[in-house]
Amino acid sequence: MGKILIVDDSSTVRDEVAGFLVKNGMEVLTAVDGRDGLDKLKHDADIRLVVCDVNMPNMDGLTMAEKLRSELGNTQVNIIMLTTESNPSMKERGKAAGVKGWIVKPFKGDSVVETFRKLSA
């Protein structure tokens, strides 16, 4: 199983999600915004899943997803948005960028693990 990258500008959310995933035996990296996340994706081919917020400074999560697909040409990494946003137009933009799941905060850690397991099956 590959690594999971958590991209969120909130250290509380990053720590909570990462802690839950590590307890479930998964290897986790973190990034503070979309720009940092994209940089980590450029340099680590073992990342298989990105769990990402939408609203972040420097680069938002949807822009990061679009750049991952268009600029890096990476279609192998699965992307799940973990966000307070539930706007249908944002979800459509995410779908167009290859986002595979949309989890609305507050979340249950089990939902992230379950979604990852479905995507890796």
Which residues are covered by each model-predicted region?
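Charged docking surfaces used in two-component/phosphorelay signaling
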Residues: 15-23
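Active-site beta3 strand of CheY-like receiver
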Residues: 45-51
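Active-site residues of response regulator receiver
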Residues: 53, 83
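Receiver (REC) domain active-site loop signature in two-component systems and cognate sites
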Residues: 56
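Short, glycine/charged-rich "phosphate-handling" switch motifs in NTP-dependent
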Residues: 100
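C-terminal output helix
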Residues: 107-116
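Short hydrophobic/Thr-rich beta-strand motif most characteristic of the beta2 strand and flanking loop
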Residues: 25-32, 40, 103
